[in-house]
Design a protein with these regions (language model features):
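A conserved hydrophobic position in a structured secondary element of the catalytic/binding core
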Residues: 125
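Cell wall/extracellular polymer interaction/catalysis modules
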Residues: 1-120, 128-146
């Protein structure tokens, strides 16, 4: 069981539509909060989330859009270091990743949920389920959203 975007699935996602993109996607590295948990068991590259990490969600910033950034007040972004536990485990889904198109959508992650509340376009799982999946997936694993 998982949560998806508040407005469902979309074959033509746009920034801010609260929809999860449909398709087959590669996944990125695992980002995790090492101050809250030990490094998970996985073959994915594991990156510790620090207070200065963000993900640019500003379609007007062509250079940084839909990329990991150092938090900067001048760049619109999603903070990865949060008070809640949503991003204690986070895997970016490679949607709009290689040939980034401004406004097509950013910050599409696999992250944690406590109550399966709808997301802003991500896939959210309970921690216990994501930890099981992390043991099974590899760098070349793809996710199919349909």
């Amino acid at each position: 069981k998982c949560s998806i975007g508040k407005n469902g699935l979309s074959k033509s996602k746009i920034e801010g539509d609260l929809k999860t993109p449909v398709g087959i996607f590669s996944i990125e590295h695992l980002y995790y909060r090492n101050d809250r948990m030990e490094k998970p068991i996985t073959t994915l590259k594991c990156i510790k989330i620090d207070k200065n990490m963000g993900w640019c969600d500003d379609p007007l910033n062509k250079e940084k859009y839909n990329k990991l950034i150092k938090v900067n007040k001048k760049i619109k972004h999603e903070k990865l270091y949060r008070r809640d536990h949503k991003y204690d485990l986070l895997i970016p889904i490679k949607y709009n990743f290689v040939k980034r198109v401004a406004g097509k959508g950013s910050c599409i992650f696999i992250h944690l949920t406590k109550n399966y509340a709808p997301t802003a376009g991500c896939i959210a799982l309970k921690k216990k389920d994501l930890l099981i999946i992390l043991k099974l997936i590899k760098k070349n694993t793809k996710i199919k959203i349909y």
